[in-house]
Amino acid sequence: MKKIVSYMMTGILLLSFLLTGCGSPEPQTGKKMSMYYINTAETKVEVHEQYLNTKTLDEQLDETMRYLSTTPEKLEYKAPLDMGFRVLDYEAEDGKLLINVDKAYSELSPTTEVLVRAAIVRTLTQLPNVKYVGITVEDSQLYDNAGEMVGWMNAEQFINNDGNEI
């Protein structure tokens, strides 16, 4: 009889250990950010929530740039900084973030280029002390497909109309 009770107690103890991992997931911590990605058809940007685990602006900027360079788990989205060009460097100063990319950026289609800019700017202007984002191509000013200079941008410059971005 003692053996049966002992086996039952051992079983209950093991079961309780196994079930402790079945609870609800622990809440995410850190700064909640909306990360913007491009759908695979390259017709709109999609938002996904992420939590930054860093504190300083430089660390948050580095972490955000890593997110924007990494293809999401859902393969129906593309990372805006993983579209065939490289970020050479970036620098934040006085509320402005300047991103310098290689000349492969100039080979993006006009639609894709606007979506990439929208995703980058909408994401990065959520960081504290980043009010504007500028993009240069190998240290030269960026021009749009109409030949107009693209200067400092903020999130309000990009429309959001449920999938018809352009």
Locate each region found by the language model.
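Bimodal "functional hotspot" detector
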Residues: 2-15, 21-166
